Amino acid sequence: MYSISLVVNMQCISAYGSILSLPLRSNLFSVRKLSSFPHKSFSGQHGKLVRMKATPTRACHDQESNRKFKRLPLSKWGHHFLSAQVDVSEMNALAQEIERLKPEVGEMLMFSSKSIESTKKRILFIYMLVSLGVAFHFEDEIEQSLEEGFEKIQEMIAGEDDLYTISIMFWVFRTYGYNMSTDVFKRFKGENEKFMESITSDVKGMVSLYEAAHLRTTREDILEEALSFTTRNLESLARAGASSPHILMRIRNALCMPQHYNAEMIFAREYISFYEQEEDHNKMLLRFAKINFKFLQLNWIQELKTLTKWWKQQDLASKLPPYFRDRLIECYLFAIMIYFEPQFSLGRVSLAKINTVFTLVDDTCDRYGNVSEVAALVQCVERWDPDCMDSLPDYMKTVFKFAWNTFEECENAGIMEEGLSYDVQGALEEWEQGDVVPTFDEYLEIGGVEVTMYVSIACSFLGLGQSSREQAYKWLKSRPKFVEAQAKRARLMNDIAGFEGDMSRGFDVNAIMYYMKQYKVTEEETFTRLQKMARDLDTTVNEEILKTTKSVPRQILKRAIDFGKMIEFTYRSGEEYTHPEGRFKDHITSLFVDLIRL
């Protein structure tokens, strides 16, 4: 969804050879090919290759049939935010109260006692700060507390048999990159080596164990068991409806989207409502969380007003056929998932604009352009020269101008002094020879590079300062296993969610099709296996995060992690970006329309 499509590239290879690539560069980007990035060599011992002649698809038909595109749902939001009114005096008052309450909350975190019980309470309090969406105010204090706490981990867990406490401590330490051992959960098993049924009566403990289980790494069987055990029991509780309403909502939200995968502010909106209904909630902490959230909401609404005005000025609807997805607000929601904090306003707005460019280019290639037009557009973007537009049809000139102007805006705003360029040319050359369809594993490697991290995550770093961006790009260029696993997982989720749409448009360049052809299995069995493969990649991602924490600054690693959450959010219940009903609409409403009540 964020790039010139691999589908079109592969369709065009036999006709156009190596000119087809995945560029992302303007004069502000240094010219770097993907071939300059270390590539894993494909094994000389391939699985069985599937050889076939290239067959024309809808994108390769004549001009008339190629223009038979499916009209997608219009934006539900239109110019809604253009008329939004934000009271600046209210924002100033909220900012002042945040600054007044912040030291008091900080004292609750950093109280002087260094006893084991106090340290334990501090870790539990960190979970509250994260869940309520205010942890970014106290990152230094949190890191200090966790570093001190992890040194005392054995003392803290000794004799501790409260499921909630153990699970929350595990979640917090793992989330911040501290590799707390899973052995701590053995105390909740009986003589039969299974989790004791008695713990099912501790509903909050069960939810916390469920959340902790999603931070499992490879070969952590006890957490696999915990996930199965808690999922089964929580689903039963949700069906029975016997708990209090706010507990039931917490269970259902967790089953729908575990906290580990959820966007920080989406989870915070839900958790604030949950925490308010807890009898033992801290009134001052709750007020701080609410004031902070409303302040963020007003900032976001201001930015959406600016973005909506910008989008209206582009007037793409009058310049292009209605083949593309009008998803400005959804693009901004994605940006919120990467950068929600007030200080990242410029990066957030720029990222939202860039997301609209990627969406338009992707739809142009996937849904409307024919092979020769796409090839011409790719060449033009590769050269990044407005003079080359003469070779483009009129509608593609509009697409190129929009991309050019948007990147120029970001450059002029000072958000893109340095960047990366990616080109799939080298990776695709092996596929060009002899009409050979790549093996499933080869497709996953190159497909993952193309559609997810190695382009989109580079743009996700744009909100960081220049020195941090340079460090982030250097890390990304090393092709870390964490990003590689995220990319493969995203490729699988994208292809699983988009399979029916791909087939309806005649595109068979899809992980499901490659797997079925290579391994001679049914579509149903393929879906089952690939879904398991995606789950297994979860554990690899978690493991690599723990390995990477000490070598990569948290502000860089967090953007990559949050990008993975964005992918999870988009595809967990289908291709919701294309059809943004349900959760997309609900979350946009809760974040940008319904202001939190103080």
Swiss-Prot record:
Keyword match Transmembrane: no
Chain span(s) of sequence motif DDXXD motif: 362-366
Cofactor: Mg(2+); Mn(2+)
A single MF term (Gene Ontology): magnesium ion binding
Tissue and organ expression note: Expressed exclusively in siliques.
Gene3D superfamilies from the UniProt entry: Farnesyl Diphosphate Synthase (1.10.600.10), Terpene synthase, N-terminal domain (1.50.10.130)
Top-level taxon of the source organism: Eukaryota
One GO cellular component, as annotated: cytoplasm
Keywords linked to the UniProt accession: Cytoplasm, Lyase, Magnesium, Manganese, Metal-binding
Pfam families, A to Z: Terpene_synth, Terpene_synth_C
GO biological process, one term: terpene biosynthetic process
Protein name stated in the entry: Terpenoid synthase 1
Gene encoding the protein: TPS01
